[in-house]
Design a protein with these regions (language model features):
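Composition-driven recognition of glycine/serine/threonine/acidic- and proline-rich low-complexity segments
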Residues: 1-252
Length: 252
């Protein structure tokens, strides 16, 4: 198997698969493929077989279906492009060396990689933290390619070193990093600061990848340019609904 990442702003991951080699991805990620590539879409790839494997993927923000792309007979070409400006990051996964990634962060992987929910220290991580706190866990044996949006800042945290991050900027981190929810200090800061209520607290040791273009923030920035009728529908709940909506937007 050969792979390369080409491009800068909107990179693409290209493979040349030898006969019988395969790559898995969530359904709908394909960009192009050669004539010798055979597609098989199933619920059993990427998380173990059966209902439990499907539940793990969906709970982590993934898709019910996964697709396997296999070269049959002759080498085959296969490619996956990013959906947003950003970077494609390969990580080597092995037992005891798992990764946590944001829920839109999985692009593709070798067949023995499993995708599931990243259970965290606090229940609030899955409910109150927005997109940045709903994490997928990448485990198994092989290579996974992650899709992170915007520019990347890579930090190697030392044991006990802590960094508090707006949730949407958490792209990925090694499972050795401790993750929990903290709140922004001060009631005035929460209400009027415009930075939301919750922060992700990351404590080393381990590597973290911070992304500069959270998908939720990009969507929020584009929202103001939508037709007025579409914007008005977001506040039909009245004044209270508007206040709640504003708070939720800031949590992203």
């Amino acid at each position: 198997m050969q792979s390369r990442i080409t491009g800068t702003t909107m990179p693409v991951l290209e493979f040349i698969l030898d006969p019988n080699e395969s790559i898995i991805s969530e359904a709908g990620e394909l960009s192009w493929m050669g004539s010798s590539i055979q597609m098989t879409t199933h619920t059993q790839f990427g998380g173990g077989g059966g209902l439990f494997g499907v539940i793990k993927r969906v709970a982590g923000g993934g898709s019910i279906f996964m697709t396997e792309y296999r070269a049959i007979g002759t080498p085959g070409e296969l490619a996956f492009a990013t959906k947003l400006p950003g970077h494609i990051v390969p990580v080597e996964v092995s037992p005891g060396h798992d990764y946590m990634i944001h829920r839109q962060g999985f692009l593709c992987a070798t067949p023995q990689i499993q995708i599931g929910v990243g259970f965290q220290q606090s229940l609030g991580a899955g409910i109150f933290g927005g997109d940045g706190f709903l994490l997928q866990k990448v485990s198994g044996q092989g290579i996974a390619w992650l899709e992170l949006s915007g520019e990347l800042v890579v930090r190697d945290l030392q044991p006990g070193e802590n960094l508090r991050v707006h949730p949407g900027h958490v792209g990925a981190f090694q499972a050795s990093v401790s993750f929990q929810i903290t709140t922004i200090p001060g009631i005035k800061n929460m209400i009027f600061g415009g930075d939301g209520i919750f922060l992700a607290s990351l404590t080393g040791p381990g590597r973290i990848w911070l992304q500069t273009l959270p998908i939720a923030k990009l969507a929020h920035a584009i929202e103001r340019y939508l037709p007025r009728e579409a914007s008005r529908q977001t506040v039909e709940g009245g004044v209270v609904g508007g206040i709640v909506g504003s708070i939720l937007d800031n949590m992203r």
